[in-house]
A protein has these predicted regions:
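Non-heme di-metal
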Residues: 2-341
């Protein structure tokens, strides 16, 4: 009597749509989903009233910087969310991972709502708000960053499944782009401007909301890097010199795109914030992303911004401690934001 062939266990990027959560193949992804639930916050908890007063105190150059920042925020997380649905959820074949991605999509929606609220508060003129939402079309420095994103989306959007090593390599580059370059560099650059204002006692509401967005984005990036680690264990042949060079070139291109944005925001420079210091900061962050991916750093720069060292950690911790017990979701362990800067 013949026996049924033994089922071959699939890899994370194998085509298919696994549904079974028991037994779990990737329990770490499930634990990340559970941890993310503990970090729930809502836009209504961010108080922007004092920001309106602060905005009136800003110099013309600082007001220009804020206008550009909220214009970038208006579209940045929407691009991330679209790639999450159209690419990551489609090709990461793990129900545990898809649980986390579902939660991440919710968090991206909260971020979009937060930035929408920022726009309504910071830009009361309807024409100014409309221009901010059209930033991808009418602001060259933001358009350059968007085109960088779309290039890596277009690389995989027509793939129905990851049948070949070439397909999987293209997917990995998309995943690394959104984790290391977009969430891990573009948004970290934006956070630096926010915390620069915060270090001067300005825009408390923006900084508070950014603390919570930052915590979410750090978890998103960490999840994506764990996916990369898992694929590296399952299919090490994908991680050759070609991929290393492509990722390094990608990070270099992302740094240059973000520097173009910095030139737009900083102009001739503001006290404590200029293009040269942003270049050093971005190079430092890019090196950290490369190191996390197991590749050699290329810049050797150090973080020039003292205000980025654990900025806002105490407030972030206090937020979760002071919530009403009927709504509170516990946060366990320590809050360490320093490493990823």
């Amino acid at each position: 009597m013949s026996t049924a062939p033994e089922k071959t266990e699939k890899n994370l990027l194998d085509p298919g749509f696994e549904l079974t959560l028991r037994p779990m193949r990737y329990p770490d992804f499930y634990e990340r989903y559970r941890d993310a639930i503990k970090n729930t916050w809502t836009v209504e908890e961010v108080d922007l009233h004092s920001d309106v007063t602060d905005l009136a105190k800003l110099s013309q150059g600082e007001q220009h910087m804020i206008g550009r920042l909220v214009a970038f925020f208006a579209t940045g997380d929407s691009i991330v969310a679209n790639n999450l649905v159209l690419t990551l959820y489609k090709h990461i074949n793990s129900p545990e991972a898809r649980l986390y991605l579902s939660r991440q999509l919710f968090e991206e929606a909260v971020h979009v709502q937060f930035y929408l609220t920022l726009l309504d508060t910071y830009l009361p003129d309807p024409e100014d708000r409309a221009a901010a939402f059209d930033a991808v079309e009418n602001i060259p420095s933001i358009r350059e960053k968007a085109e960088f994103c779309f290039k890596w989306i277009n690389e995989v959007e027509k793939l129905d499944s990851l049948q070949t090593q070439a397909d999987r390599r293209r997917f990995l580059l998309n995943l690394i782009c959104f984790a290391a370059c977009i969430e891990g560099l573009f948004f970290y650059g934006a956070f630096a401007y926010v915390y620069w204002f915060r270090s001067r006692g300005l825009l408390h509401g923006l900084a508070t909301g950014t603390n919570w967005v930052f915590r979410d984005e750090t978890m998103h990036m960490s999840f994506a890097f764990e996916v990369v680690d898992t694929v590296r264990k399952e299919e090490p042949e994908l991680f050759d010199d070609q991929l290393r060079q492509e990722v390094t070139d990608m990070l270099r291109e992302a740094v240059e795109a973000e520097l173009q944005f910095a030139r737009d925001l900083c102009g001739d420079g503001l006290p404590g914030m200029n293009t040269d210091s942003m270049r050093q900061y971005l190079e430092c962050v890019a090196d950290q992303r490369l190191a996390r991916l197991g590749f050699a750093p290329v810049y050797g720069s150090e973080n020039p911004f003292s205000f980025m060292e654990l900025q806002g950690v105490q407030e972030l911790t206090n937020f979760f401690e002071r919530r009403p017990s009927a709504y509170q979701v516990a946060v366990e362990g320590t809050v360490d934001l320093d490493e990823d800067f």
